[in-house]
Amino acid sequence: MKHKKSIILIIISISLLGLMLIFIGPEKIVNDIRKADPLYLSLAVAVHMLTLYLWMVRWRIAVVAAKIKTKNQPLFRILVLGLATNNITPAKSGGEALRAYLLSKYSKTPFESSFATVLIDKGLDTFPLILLSIISLFHMILVFRFSLWLVIGLLITLFAVVFSFFIILYVSVKPELGKKVKRGIMRIARIFYKHKSKKLSKLESRISDAIVKYQDAVRLMIKNKNVIYVALPLSFVIWFLEIIRIWAVFWAFGVYISPIIIAEVMIVATLVSMVPIFPGGLGAIEGLMILFYSMAGVPLPLSAAITIVERLISFWLTIFLGVATLPYFGSDMVGKVFK
């Protein structure tokens, strides 16, 4: 049922995007795409691949800090499949759990420890997101003169993301809060396991063990110097490379645009992709990118051409790479991804 919903949402998203492109003018868009410089497009693809590799390096720092043993190659495949799964699920919600599951399976470690590494890896993105959001929102107010309500909406979304991460992190390192979480889960469990004291006792023991393993893994990573002094700066490098990739696509079309505007579009696209409507923000993100670039002075058909090519690299290439890893994980994994 879930995979049918995702397929329907993808079809709706692509249909809306198609209508948008028809309105702009397909012939003009195709003509602009034909003029793109292959050298700069190759550079954009190379930067994207480098970004994925550095993402794996950053995650590996958390994995090593949690004392989980695995090699680079399977870790890269797991990362790419997780990112591809995010691109086909609303609010990018499926990839993290899949990454934790696969890491747990192939490293033969508890799922709780694997999930903790994914939490830290995602959390490291919060810091460049905050910095770029502050710069971008001020620039949006001054240059684009967006309505106050739109800016407030973006600020609320950003605050919700940051607040949620730090709350989860705080709960993750405080043993007493872990006990409260366990009590809350047990209260719900007692509704479904009335008059089954043995099952409740086993469940309580498993939950306690899971929370302890998870919190131990988080504390190990936070105390590790490499997480702070290597992985955190690497997060800023990864975001910088994202901007360079988009910039390279603009160069391919002979267009110069301020990197601040690119950063703004990235931030808005990131926040929009977190809204649980369309898979990976498909359709909505493309529309916003075309709108922003045209407002920055890029002709509408050219904005559409640049957006299509950029999304082919950042969105669809990632999905293709993720699908290409499925044979490595076995036929059973195909069902798990598309459930």
From Swiss-Prot:
Coiled coil: none annotated. Its main location: membrane. It is a multi-pass membrane protein. It is found in: Cell membrane. The chain crosses the membrane at residues 6-26, 37-57, 124-144, 148-168, 227-247, 248-268, 287-309, 312-332. Keywords: Cell membrane, Membrane, Transmembrane, Transmembrane helix. GO terms for cellular component: plasma membrane. The keyword Kinase does not apply. It comes from the Archaea. InterPro entries: L-PG_synthase/AglD. Belongs to the UPF0104 family. This is UPF0104 membrane protein Mfer_0536. It comes from Methanothermus fervidus (strain ATCC 43054 / DSM 2088 / JCM 10308 / V24 S).
